[in-house]
Amino acid sequence: MTKNDITRGLIDFAVSQCLKNIKEDPYRSIRRLADLGRQFAKGRFQEELFSLFQRLLLNEDGPYYETLKQLVSSVDTDSLKTLGINIGYNSWTCGASRLRQITAEKDYPHWLAEISLSPESSASQLKEQLSAALKNGTYAFRLHMPAQSITTDTRQLGLIREFPDCSFFLDFMDTDCTYSDDLLELTCSCDNLAFLVPFGSLQSRQLVDLLNARQRIYGVCRTYDNTNAAERISDSQISEMLSWGSPLLFFLAAADTTQDNRLLVDNAILDARLHQTYPALLIHL
């Protein structure tokens, strides 16, 4: 057993206790989670991030307490704990340390790797990609579903269980949001998996309803371009996204979006976080 294994075990126990007590004493339990992150942070990025969390949580009247309480009450506890530790410790701490070590050796890889689940790719090819990224310190993966998502090879998605220390984000953004019963049951049984669902269509909303019923973690995502960047971050459109039931809201720029419009959205999201404008965590992909 390695030092990291022991540390993860301690974190697992502490997080379990916090999640157990969060309904009775949300303020203390949620602050304890932020304190844990700061305590085990190894790099400057992690220390600054969890220090920011601690400062934001000083405002007991802010919306983030309700946001986290909603997550705990609506999402399966094992999934919430697994994804939280895999991202906060494995990706942002252990993985980040490895990524810093190899910076001088090759181009700096991102902590979140993007992989397309094309029908032409085999499960063995995907396993090789995941294993190679893991060696470099990447523990989080955004898996892009094919346009007709129902055609996804379940053998590929079955690999998620073979990498329990990793986090996976199943991206439906470029799909028709169709699915088979086998696909849904397989993905909903993986505690280290979250879903990215596009806002807007009836098929998307039906998928969200099924994920809610199964207490799965998902984020609602909206794309923007040069014609609607300001509109996408307006109070009215963010309220529309919140009506779908997830406090995790993602914003994705179209490929030809200018840097000025990307910065517009980026700054608006940062401002909303710091001023705790919404009962949600806004994330710019």
Report each predicted region and the residues it spans:
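Compact recognition or signaling/catalytic modules
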Residues: 158-159, 165-175, 242-243, 265-269, ...
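A short linear-motif detector with a strong N-terminal bias
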Residues: 91-96, 148-149, 260-262
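Generic detector of solvent-exposed, compositionally biased contiguous segments
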Residues: 1-8, 14-27, 35-75, 162
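Core AdoMet radical
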Residues: 111-124, 133-151, 160-179, 184-203, ...
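N-terminal [4Fe-4S]-dependent radical SAM core
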Residues: 41-116, 139
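Radical SAM enzyme [4Fe-4S]-AdoMet core and its adjacent flexible, acidic
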Residues: 1-39, 191-285
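A generic secondary-structure signal
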Residues: 102, 128-136, 158-159, 185-186, ...
